[in-house]
Amino acid sequence: MRFRTGKLTRVAIAAAAVLALGATFAAPLPQEAQAAPAAQADTDYCGGQCSDILPPGATGNATLADILANRVFGTHPAHSADQLGPYSDLAQGYPTLTDDKLNTFFNDSSFGVPADQVESVTKPRDDVSITRDKKTGVPHIQGTTREGTEFGAGYAAAQDRLWLMDLFRHVGRGELTSFAGGAASNQGLEQDFFRQAPYNEADYQAQIDYILATGGERGKQALADAQAYVDGINAYAKKAKDGRYFPGEYVLTGHIDAITNAGEIAPFKLTDLIALASVVGALFGNGGGGEVEGALSMLAAQQKYGLAEGTKVWESFRQRNDPEAVLTVHDGKGFPYADKPASPKGTAMPDPGSVTAEPLVYDREGSATPAKAGARTTVKAPAKLDKLRGIYDDGVLPRDLFSRKKGMSNALVVSGKYTASGKPVAVFGPQTGYFAPQLLMLQEIQGPGISARGASFAGVGMYVQLGRGQDYAWSATTSAQDVTDTYAVELCSPDGSAPTKDATYYRYHGECLPMDKLERRNAWKPTVADSTAAGSYRMQVYRTKYGLVTHRATVGGKPVAYTSLRATYRHEADSIVGFQMFNDPGYVTDAKSFQSAAQHINYTFNWFYADSRQTAYYNSGLNMRRADGVDPSLPVKAEPAYEWKDFDPAVNTAAYTPAAEHPQSVDQDYYISWNNKVAKDYGAAAFGNGSVHRGNLLDDRVRALVKKGGVTRAALARAMGEAAVTDLRGEDVLPELLKVLRSQPIDDPAVASAVQSLESWQAAGSQRRETSAGSHTYGHTDAVRIMDAWWPLLVEAEFKPGLGGELYDALRTNLSVDESPSAGHGPTGSHAGSSFQYGWWSYVDKDLRAVLGEDVKGPLAKPYCGGGELSACRDALLGSLKQAAAKPATEVYPGDDNCAAGDQWCADAIIQRTVGGLTHDKISWQNRPTFQQVVEFARHR
């Protein structure tokens, strides 16, 4: 796909925009120091065999003139969109990929910048320089002192992501609407986040104090690094504000006057970094929860089938330890954790019909009230800004960014025993959605005790979080093991009277204590960017020693509050020490030292490592030791006997499982991860880890490569690229569907034609891929349409008659039926890339194989399709297929603000969600990491 890069230089673009705006809105560009050669690092052991990419581009800041030029002329500031084309092109280019073509689709990630490739050098102070390369504009930070190095990292982060960082610190503080506007999406997002991670200023400071008290010398160094990083951010922000080349979004959202320059960019504080860390933790580093919803579906199963049989049915759908699930650690070693106890104790099931969700929002006024929701007000602004009116009317971030299940990112790592060179090969990266600017930013940091290049979340980039060191590379995927429990807290009244469900006092160790109330009052007014009329509301969350109140209910007739207790709550920043270690070449020297560093990270991540000699894996997280007999999948009584072992509510700490009990491995033949089940006996925290998972798309391909031997970087990248355009349903479930349909001759011509289309598509690889680059038309387009229309219909036809409506709906709450690219309900909303993680693929697969009489390990408790009769099952599938085949494309793909109805390619297409003022072209769907590395180290220190 070709992308318009624009023939104007950034200066010319800005000048054109200035002419359009008038001199009063001119924003001079920052003056860079004279370019000087950047010294090549002599500590790079990759030998030119490390590559990476992060779309859409390194530049994430845009002046008001830049934004207007983008909206009027379609131009982009330098390096803000130059990675989108190469990233997109891999969807068509992967089949013929060779090692020497890798950097057509990726960039050389060697340390340093060759002298003839230096675009600019900035020296924000004497002890640090920021060199940017001509090809990508990525900052290469070189410091002579530790403080200067981190100051430079903060300065570079502000150069590239100042607006984004400011936005997310307000998200982290539950203040998005008051900062960016009252759009309905902004309201919903800040409410979802505040519900998960409500804090007050003392809580933020307490996290800093905890690191100082418990982190040793490394903890103290980490906070010193963070302070220098903050100082660098603030230095650039002040310079940009004074020089009037700050991000134009500050003008459009009413924070700075474009004519007088009145207003401010509020200085960042260390506590802002804690708020930012809480956002990262909530998005990608959590696991577990949902026990109330699990209890409700169990009750529905018990109501339909009786206590014993209903529990058995529920457990078969829960799939805590499915024997057919694809595993990351597949050498047979087990790591028992969070499984069902033999004799559950303390389970606190709600009385039927008693559960109510805890209210969050109070005191609504103006456009926050239902009566005035959607009301808009046009503010006065120069006519030249009309093109920018309402750019945030739909919000700055997806409404469901925090409410939807997430667990993205993938990894493919092969031991040197099976590669052509004898050196390990890895293709891996985080799948964090698509935003403009991107949530991640690329950087290289070289200074005392730090030597790394890679990606960091903007605003907490003191260290490279995912990337490469001198002779090793690392990456992560979300593991989301269960580190969150739900407690049923008994309510009480301080005067001894009978409490109601709404009581704000609870029992703790025999005392009747008041709940803490955490509040946030937000108000907004219309701006050029967000015309939502003025409004306000108050958010309120009650906190107990057992966590945050999420629901109210009765248990055995007694009123309770269900609370969510997350191990990482109040500890989101603790992981800073582990990331510091990853960047320290004096600490990470081999697989074991890398695993040791990963032990200092409390986020629930799968960590992968490769150097020239070894590969390794480690699963990190605060895996608490539960009381004996506690079922982690269901609510438990809030009593001392069922608390986490050594639980200290004052700081939310407990006894945790030792490192040896965390899933881990060194030099396994290969590792894959796409948020699949981690290891044998390691209980899945959520529904859906069964016989069919998108991890199978990787595992099948990498296993075949390893069996053949001679694996290269390109071969592994091809395997990833093929999986990235493959429909999981077509590859791993459609064969069983076709077996059932073909069990007898098909007489209906329309159905026969549909089956033939599906068979042809399946035989060709079940791909969702353009016929040629830029065609915007899929091969086997009709089969893809039929599959998209059929899947939700066939699941309902297969399961709803047997389960009954109530249980079917309850299980759909636990696990969504589908997650196709066009469904519009992906982890980061529609057009988000990541697909096929959450769905009923395993249920359909196991049920159909049982009906076909095939061997099924870990089967569903009952057959559902056609009541277990093959002919009746076939009839159900035929009927739903006929209905699906008749659906026109305009109904299957109804269109949205970005796509016309019936446009299949567009419905799938990835769109960089506009967080700043710049827009970008759509790209073809791929299911792959946002930031991605391809590495093969040539030698070792």
Features from the language model and the residues they span:
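Secretory targeting and sorting signals
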Residues: 1-36
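Substrate-recognition/specificity elements adjacent to catalytic centers across diverse enzyme folds
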Residues: 38-425, 430, 454-455
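Terminal end segments
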Residues: 54, 63, 72, 76-78, ...
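Second-shell loop/turn segments in exported
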Residues: 149-153, 204-224, 565-567, 579-585, ...
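Stable alpha-helical elements in mature extracytoplasmic
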Residues: 204, 222-232, 236, 436, ...
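Glycine- and hydrophobic-rich flexible loops that cap the catalytic core of alpha/beta enzyme folds
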Residues: 447-448, 452-461, 466-472, 476-643
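Hydrophobic alpha-helical segments
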Residues: 484, 603-705, 794-799, 803-807, ...
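Charged, long alpha-helical assembly modules
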Residues: 778-865
